[in-house]
Amino acid sequence: MDQARSAFSNLFGGAPLSYTRFSLARQVDGDNSHVEMKLAVDEEENVDNNVRSNHASLTKPKRFNGSFCYAVIAVIIFFLIGFMIGYLGYCKRVEPKSECGRSGDSKEIEGTEPPETEEYFPETPSRLLWTDLRTMLSERLTATEFTNTIKRLNGNSYVPREAGSQKDESLAFFIENQFREFKLNKVWRDEHFVKIQVKGSNAQSSVTVVNGSGDMISLVENPTGYVAYSKATTVTGKLVHANFGTKEDYEALSYPVNGSLVIVRAGEITFAQKVANAESLNAVGVLIYMDQAKFPIVNANLPVFGHAHLGTGDPYTPGFPSFNHTQFPPSQSSGLPNIPVQTISRAAAEALFANMKGDCPSSWKTDSSCRLEFPGDKNVKLTVNNELKEIRIFNVFGVIKGFEEPDRYVVIGAQRDAWGPGAAKSSVGTALLLELARIFSDMVSKGGFKPSRSIVFASWGAGDFGAIGATEWLEGYLSSLHLKAFTYINLDKAVLGAKNFKVSASPLLYSLIEKTMQEVKHPVTGLSLYRDSNWINKVEKLSFDNAAFPFLAYSGIPALSFCFCEDTEYPYLGTTMDTYEVLSQNVPELSRLTRAAAEVAGQLLIKLSYDVELNLNYDMYNDKILSFVKDMNQFRADIKEMGLNLQWLYSARGDFFRATSRLTTDYKNAERANRVVMREINDRIMKVEYHFLSPYVSPRESPFRHIFWGSGSHTLSALLEHLKLRQKNSGAFNETLLRNQLALATWTIQGAANALSGDIWDIDNEF
């Protein structure tokens, strides 16, 4: 090393004994370069000793060669050291998580032990596959657990549990404690003070037959059941039968109903719709009964319960939440009836038929005892003595927070209360809710399941009175919910039979539902739930008495409800016979069917909360809009006679189609790993439903603003009905109203197209 140091010193002029000079100067008289190398102490010594010292001149090259080699070696060593330092520093800066300079093919020397140093292995985030998650869910679903939970919920501790009762509150606290035991990320409850209608405490309601002078001939019944939100009054009139009380039934009648009491069969449509239809034709009151043909119940004296509010939520705080001490002026929903309505037993209905004449049409397929109308010398007197009562209700919540987007969530819920035992109506749904909360919490804590988005479990209060708990929650937090909640799954009445699997849902969820039906097998047949490729055309609209309805029609949140059921309606809903024993007798495979319902809901939850892309198929609304345009084309002649045309509707429809196509292109080109880009696309998708809420009507006056699934003159169905009225009864047709309906419907579709396009500079429409 000393020799190398000496050589290095000599190279840079440290030693005066010798040096090397390279002359690269070009010759003046030629193009060739000349290189001259000299070794000397100095130039003078070199000249003086040039001839004299031959020996010295022979030995000097040896000194030079050794020094030069050492110098070159030193330079190379320093160069290599510098190169290695620079290379290692570069690796650490550019690839901090990789093993720099390590060859994957290197092997340890035999007979030597590796150094006792801790090696760094980078953590690669593992993402569970769909098959893994599906198996994880299936392994945790136990049929007996569902049966045990249903039994427990229908024990004496929680039955009966009418909304606001002590047993209803006890069950709410039990569910809250269960959520805490399941170790959900957060558990809470909110309370509302609402008005419901109950049976009168001072006087009974009654149905009597009277003569022309109003004197009582006979007491038919003092009903045990009742219809909440009926007008409390007394009316008298001729009794006429109107089958189920649908609009089509009234159109087929050969006698008027104005000024008369109407008796109708339960089923087909809700109690509230039956009353609204009768009131629109100036009937003075409505009686509702369950005929044996549709509801084959042995007990002819079985009482029935329901409600007559054509809407959801507390009807005395329409459009705003029923929190305590809210300072709103007294008001009431426009969906409350102005006529009395009462349920009666089948025995009471048959007693009334005994005084009536005219056989019911065979097309009604009802009991042989059915009759059409009272004779002219007799009437029926109806007295309803229901009372308003303010109660406190609870909604109970638990959440599993998402790991990447906790502020986006899917909500799954079930009604908790019931007028009777409520086994099929609320216990099955509540059991599903509890078991799914337990299972998903276990999947997260022990199975490695990491949902990207949050899952909210909700137990609703006062569901029997028109989804009051769910609606009040939506009204209270509407400003944030439509930005964050992207799907609601309803578990109410999920198991009512075994033959069929039926779904009611937003079109955005059709594709996801179809995939789920293909994955889940029917527990009885062993075949896939997906049996009919035309199932979408058989999907029924969500009804007013379904808790999923306000999510879709009021809040613009995609919602779905499903059930295992028979071809006929389950006869014991809303009666005192809705017990666990009756349910298990009518549905022998109750435990297995409940497990299958949980598997359906569970798979939906996984796909909605876990997948990078949001499983909402916005293309389905292209079909809905196209179908509406085709229906409108049938009235082109009428529209032309009014000096109107459908060009702007065609343009709006085209813009919506282009917007969906552009979004599909953006989605296909997006980098799945880029969560920011995917979130922006998903946010555009999740707001599609919301943009079909008409911005031109008041949420208070017309709370169900959805133009496809809502209720009111702003809906597309109301527009079509109005055009039909021009052909049937031109005197009742209002051209100004129709012009407004067409313009606002067109602009709502156009607004949805613009919103779906993204930023305003990306909007490219022909409107």
Swiss-Prot record:
Gene Ontology biological process: intracellular iron ion homeostasis; iron ion transport; positive regulation of B cell proliferation; positive regulation of isotype switching; positive regulation of T cell proliferation; receptor internalization; transferrin transport
UniProt keyword terms in alphabetical order: Cell membrane, Disulfide bond, Endocytosis, Glycoprotein, Lipoprotein, Membrane, Palmitate, Phosphoprotein, Receptor, Signal-anchor, Transmembrane, Transmembrane helix
Motif (Stop-transfer sequence): 60-63
Extracellular topology ranges: 89-767
Origin superkingdom: Eukaryota
Gene Ontology molecular-function annotations: transferrin receptor activity
Protein name in the entry: Transferrin receptor protein 1
Organism annotation: Equus caballus (Horse)
Gene: TFRC
